[in-house]
Amino acid sequence: MANSTTVTEFILLGLSDACELQVLIFLGFLLTYFLILLGNFLIIFITLVDRRLYTPMYYFLRNFAMLEIWFTSVIFPKMLTNIITGHKTISLLGCFLQAFLYFFLGTTEFFLLAVMSFDRYVAICNPLRYATIMSKRVCVQLVFCSWMSGLLLIIVPSSIVFQQPFCGPNIINHFFCDNFPLMELICADTSLVEFLGFVIANFSLLGTLAVTATCYGHILYTILHIPSAKERKKAFSTCSSHIIVVSLFYGSCIFMYVRSGKNGQGEDHNKVVALLNTVVTPTLNPFIYTLRNKQVKQVFREHVSKFQKFSQT
């Protein structure tokens, strides 16, 4: 279908129309974005500078931190600009690009979370072969496959949406270009792209969740059969942070996207739930992974101590 689009820009309504709340919302999101960048860059820095953290687990964590930075940077800068300037518009191309990157990076995160759960499964359930199975080459291949899977799954439905005609209203009741609000503005039959979106959401979300759940089922079974209480606690502590992240991220996304149809989605509810996987979860992730990880905390304290000694000389 030829693109007979007449709309050149969209209006993002954001979270609230109340003028008195705009400054508060802006400051809140600005602080949140700063914390996300600080926390994830800190993870990247720590896992790069200390050779003790040159392990598959921290290699995957570093890649996940990079993904989180890009994922949130797709939304936050434009959202903050719209709030502070009062101009809530986004160009047609900008909206398509934002939607594509949001789903591409988000889908890649699902696959990377599944890879991280498999890494923990091998480490706990098959520790003697861990170094052999999770070699550097395998780790690089798993990360590459995660990126390629996200790209290949999203590029087809995104290109179909891009070719659709937008000739009617241009108001999106959201704070970014999400899939369902965008499809409501298409002036043509959207059954094909809806079906593709539903299938891809089920495959990427529920498929990777099945892998993650299976891995952690085996992990919990193995942990419960460890005779030493101290070793059980140590083994569980390496996985608990990942379980928390998975629960938050998957829970919000399944609520939003694993449903067929674009009608009756409850836009206001979707905006609130979208805050979980675009704002709350990325903010909590660095703190969950660092505050619950003794090795990361130890390395961080050592580097802070070195910096303090260096600054005092």
UniProtKB/Swiss-Prot annotation:
Any GO molecular function: G protein-coupled receptor activity
Superkingdom, natural source: Eukaryota
PROSITE patterns named among the record's database cross-references: G_PROTEIN_RECEP_F1_1, G_PROTEIN_RECEP_F1_2
Pfam families, alphabetized: 7tm_4
Intrachain S-S bonds: C95-C177
Protein location: Cell membrane
GO terms under biological process: G protein-coupled receptor signaling pathway; sensory perception of smell
Protein name: Olfactory receptor 6E1
Phylogenetic classification of the source organism: Eukaryota, Metazoa, Chordata, Craniata, Vertebrata
Gene: Or6e1
